[in-house]
């Protein structure tokens, strides 16, 4: 079974690894298509996608392609690889009909479709406080995440997970699901999506990390969803790190400092309160909340803003 894999971030790398290391289904990954290396950090040094790094670090004999677009000659390159399947996981590009026609294109999408079509389904699960998390394999068509569902898997939330932890769990679940889908592809009954039930999620931007002390639960969920990037910050760009939801009922002044101790600062919201362990001002290192407040001469009863 010849597989061309299209994927870019760490989520995709987990699934690529499962395909490469799988010994049962006679799977051969014959090519990786991934995004181009991108400038990263203050020094803007080029950083390779995690999928590419995995192949290079393990010295795998898998050709890597990083095209700007998926037109010719890339279409012919794909044809020459003679794939039985094209697997797409968080690739970051829309596949044109010329590529969809080469072989069945299976997408691993981190939601229970038709819910959360688009670029940020895992963020949306967290932000919407979903009780059930899930993942789907889908036969791709020309529209965004609208193809027939092949298989899906889900689990009941037992505890709050941040983006990294939930992504990793769903990636491993997605790897198992994909292996099942590939093995059973020709006997699976495809399930058309109910497009009337579709919901969509947008690409996350820096501005999404802006928070205020209105709703404690909402602030806490944002801290989980945006932990890696863009993180959460106040209007003065003060970052709030390691946030815990304390309660979500009582009403306080917005940003009122209720308690300061070694664990952090307890801050009141219009609804509820949160404990913040660390605070980070622009261009500064993170400080324990207690030390930051001491430096600003903020005490209980004051306002964190």
UniProtKB/Swiss-Prot annotation:
InterPro entries: Fmt, Formyl_trans_C, Formyl_transf_N, Formyl_transf_N_sf, Formyl_transferase-like_C_sf, Met-tRNA-FMT_C, Met-tRNA-FMT_N. GO terms for cellular component: cytosol. GO terms for molecular function: methionyl-tRNA formyltransferase activity. CDD domains: FMT_core_Met-tRNA-FMT_N, Met_tRNA_FMT_C. It holds the Pfam family Formyl_trans_C. Keywords: Protein biosynthesis, Transferase. (6S)-5,6,7,8-tetrahydrofolate binds at residues 111-114. It catalyses: L-methionyl-tRNA(fMet) + (6R)-10-formyltetrahydrofolate = N-formyl-L-methionyl-tRNA(fMet) + (6S)-5,6,7,8-tetrahydrofolate + H(+). It comes from the Bacteria. The keyword Signal does not apply. Its EC number is 2.1.2.9. It is an enzyme of class 2 (transferase). PANTHER family: METHIONYL-TRNA FORMYLTRANSFERASE, METHIONYL-TRNA FORMYLTRANSFERASE, MITOCHONDRIAL. Belongs to the Fmt family. Attaches a formyl group to the free amino group of methionyl-tRNA(fMet). The formyl group appears to play a dual role in the initiator identity of N-formylmethionyl-tRNA by promoting its recognition by IF2 and preventing the misappropriation of this tRNA by the elongation apparatus. This is Methionyl-tRNA formyltransferase. It comes from Helicobacter pylori (strain P12). The gene is fmt.
């Amino acid at each position: 079974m010849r597989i061309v894999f299209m994927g870019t971030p760490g989520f995709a790398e987990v699934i690529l690894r499962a395909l490469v290391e799988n010994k049962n289904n006679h799977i051969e990954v014959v090519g990786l298509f991934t995004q181009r290396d991108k400038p990263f950090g203050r020094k803007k040094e080029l950083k390779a996608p995690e999928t590419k790094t995995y192949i290079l670090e393990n010295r795998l004999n898998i050709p890597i392609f990083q095209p700007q677009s998926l037109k010719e000659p890339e279409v012919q390159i794909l044809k020459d690889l003679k794939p039985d399947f094209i697997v797409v996981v968080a690739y970051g590009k829309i596949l044109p009909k010329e590529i969809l026609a080469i072989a069945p294109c299976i997408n691993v999408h981190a939601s229970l479709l038709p819910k959360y079509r688009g670029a940020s389904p895992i963020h949306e699960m967290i932000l919407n406080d979903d009780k059930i998390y899930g993942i789907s394999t889908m036969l791709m068509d020309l529209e965004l995440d609208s193809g027939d569902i092949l298989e899906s898997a889900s689990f009941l939330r037992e505890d709050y997970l941040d983006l990294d932890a939930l992504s990793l769990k769903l990636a491993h679940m997605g790897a198992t699901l994909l292996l099942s889908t590939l093995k059973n592809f020709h006997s699976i009954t495809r399930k058309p999506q109910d497009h009337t039930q579709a919901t969509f999620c947008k690409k996350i931007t820096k501005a999404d990390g802006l928070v205020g002390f209105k709703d404690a639960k909402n602030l806490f969920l944002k801290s989980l969803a945006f932990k890696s990037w863009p993180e959460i910050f106040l209007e003065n760009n003060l970052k709030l790190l390691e946030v815990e939801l304390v309660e979500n009922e009582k009403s306080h002044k917005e940003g009122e400092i209720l308690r300061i101790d070694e664990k952090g600062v307890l801050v009141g919201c219009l609804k509820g309160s949160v404990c913040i362990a660390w605070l980070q001002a622009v261009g500064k290192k993170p400080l324990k909340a207690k030390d930051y407040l001491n430096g600003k001469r903020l005490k209980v009863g004051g306002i964190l803003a």
